[in-house]
Amino acid sequence: MSTTSPQSPGFRVVARPKPAEYVPAIRPWLRPLLWGTFAGFALLGATGAYLAGVSLLNWLRPETLYTTPFTFWMFLAHGAIGLAGTLPFLLFGAAHWMTARRRPNRAAIRLGLLVFAAGVLVALTGIALFQFEGLPQLPSGTITRSVIYWAHVVLPVGAVALYVGHRRAGPRIKWGYGKAWGGVVGVTLVGMGALHGYDPRAAARKGSVEGEKYFHPSEARTADGKFIPAEALMHDEYCMKCHADIYRDHLHSAHKFSSFNNPAYTFSVNETREFGKKRDGDVRASRWCAGCHDPVVLFSGQFDNAETKFEDHPTGHAGITCVVCHSITNVHGPVGNAAYTIEEPQHYPFAYTTDAFLMWVNNQMVKAKPEFHKKTFLKPLHKSAEFCSTCHKVSLPVELNHYKDFLRGQNHYDSFILSGMGHGSRSFYFPERQKDNCASCHMPLKASGDFGAKDFDGSGRRTVHDHLFPAANTGLPALLKLDPRYSHMSDGWDRAIATHAEYLKDKKLRIDLFGVKGMRPDGSIDDSSLAVLRPDLPPLQPGSTYILETVIRTLNIGHHFSQGTVDSNEIWVEFTATDSDGRVIGRNGTTRDPDDAGPVDEWSHFVNVHMLDREGRRIDRRNPQDIFTPLYDKQIPPGAASVVHYKLAVPTDVKGPITLSVRLRYRKFDHLYMEYVHRGTGRPVPKLPVVDICADKVTLPVAGRSNRVEPQTSPIQPAWQRWNDYGIGCLLEGGVGAKRGNLRQAEVAFDKLLSLGANDAVWHGHANRARVLFELGRLGEAAAAVTASGTCDPPAPWWLRAWLSGLISAENATTAADLDAAAEQFARILDPANRPRDAAGVVTHDFGRDYVVLGRLGLTLFKRSLLEADGSPRQRAVLAGAVEAYQKALAVDPEDLPSHYGLSQCFAKLGGDATDEGPVGPATADAVRELVKALGAPGGRAATANQLAAAVTDLG
């Protein structure tokens, strides 16, 4: 409304509207929500800073795990605060928008919206990382999980910067509160860090008065020398939640049934325990068994209870649990006998709870932050062959047999290391690429939907490693299938038997009816009459006697066949000869009872070890305390062959063609052993599966008979390998390096390879001829054969030529130059710069761990030192090289006898006398003492180390 005053024409008075009342953006009723949001952010920032600091330390020093159970209480608090604060934050944001949306400062509004959006994204990414069931899962290691994780970490920092800009439109920020918060958080973080060094479990843990020695003569130990509660090691069902497929495989594995839940082992270990009670008055010697077979019983401190029947005790049925294997923190060295350190694993909160809600909380923490779980239960050592060596390499200690301090038992590890599949440079055959570890063969990848599965091989499919450990043990699942306690797992046992059987038959070995030789009237063998079977089919003469040469060859096996429990594994060849009427005219290797039941013909060719006790009796019931010496060892090295000779007398009245058939058969447990196991149980000896690993058959005509035989070819390709395998088998007859093999026959076989002219046949022929000629002492011819193996096309592998050349040069050396040349060849094989590589530059073979070559280098250098003046600097330098080579060999095999002897020779020469320059003194003696302790097994080498150190000091 306006009016014009009559006293002042031309002027207008305007009444302005009353200004609107100021409304603050933060209403009084919003302040509690704001303060709650600030408080939540402060707590989230504090716990988040702690968690980020731990993650940073883990990233900077991956060899150390800084995460502890305390970390997860902070993580749980962080998640709980975040979830609890999400709704107030959303309510505050919505209300604040309603009160401030019409403000003229549009930039402040936009920044506020960005702060709110960032907060919402932080909440959503946090919820996603918690892996709640029903929501899309983010498996560890995926790109999606990484993106969401980093968004959750970075967004709060960005939100703070945006908030500072947003607050420029309002009251000034009171930075004093922020500084106070920072100070409190900093002090708190320091206090939290101090808690990382304290393990509350240690306060209540008990141990033996013997300390670490309690576990001897097993080489196992616990991290603190104390016992581990049995329940901490018996937690397989906990693992099943995220690793269901692995759990099912392990549940039917020989590892799971390694202990008193294994009837065969139970019989043997109970006998060993009874033997110890009678001989020693206690069962301590049988701890040697428990380190590998009964870890839960041993580490919980119960094993020495001599009167406990562990076959009826829960701990006796635990076997090698998931936690046992995955709680091993260290391998002491490749000495076997359970040479590992185990600790009680640290868990996320509520790992042992039976409350459903708390169990759910625990599961969510594992899924949300799996790094601690992975670091705790999966370490680099688990991927090494040395990890497997702890229980798949065995020596019998004097505490067990009261015989001597060392007697070799099974040894998969050294066999693998020295094989062409592993790190050996001296094999007859080499794969295109060596295997990195035992798991390459025995833990194949299999498709899985487990939460813990991942794309291991880059194929795009999620897989896990097979924890059934496919190998050969078809006998144990067959026994357990008959046990009422485990009969409900029948389908699983059938699958386990089938898996092991298929694994055995999958190109692991082959058998070849290679040739036939005639016999002279005086009973001697006419080697010149050797006729190779197929494509030629020589007729057999009625009334004549023949020698049938059968070759067994190991193929895709990285260790001796069979290794393991070679005294009770029942592996044999069955040979049958029948005429056209089906009449059996020759047979060897059959079972006593029909349908593959009962004992095997004792005159069969067994591929095992015939072990004896002190009285010359066979070790026939897995009684290790009585093992004394082997009578024979017919195992077949990896990538090698064995020849079995059958004598066949052809009847004069034989009809039609004769069919010869052979098959290599496998039964896990010797029948006599099973008789012992089931004696007194009231149960019959069960029929165990017999697996036909490989077979061969050929039909030959009979001279003077009207019989037609169809053409036949051998399935073995390339055909030249038949001659090569036969030669290898003849060379190795009697043992490697025994010089009592069929060397003349081997030379003939390798000569034949040269005449065949096939590409690879020629270099094999030359190289293997060199091996034979070396054994025969014809060193000049051997050297010429090695040279020829390098000039053919293709040539023999350079490392094999270097080995043979070095061997011959060292053996034939007459000058220092000869020994230098030999040492140079050995060093060339071992030099990392010379490792063979593929076209992409990736190493395919690494021979640096071939301790036979290392030992030969040490021996050659020692011989070379003898040509220098005693005590001269040059001699000491050469001896130092020999010591280094021997020490490297002992780092791979601490029990290598030639290297120990070689070191003693070197130390004796280095010792000199008291007037020599640089005598061996106390410092060197201390170094030797520590060296021997380090190379040996814990508790088992200290006395030897002290004795050697004393001897070296005396030399000085």
Describe the residue ranges of each PLM region.
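Membrane-embedded alpha-helical bundles that constitute the cytochrome b-like, heme-associated redox core
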Residues: 2-207
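Primarily the internal scaffold of c-type cytochrome electron-transfer domains
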Residues: 9-17, 141, 173-186, 197-230, ...
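TPR alpha-solenoid repeat register
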Residues: 763-765, 797-801, 839, 853, ...
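Residue-level recognition of tetratricopeptide repeat
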Residues: 719, 760-762, 794-798, 836, ...
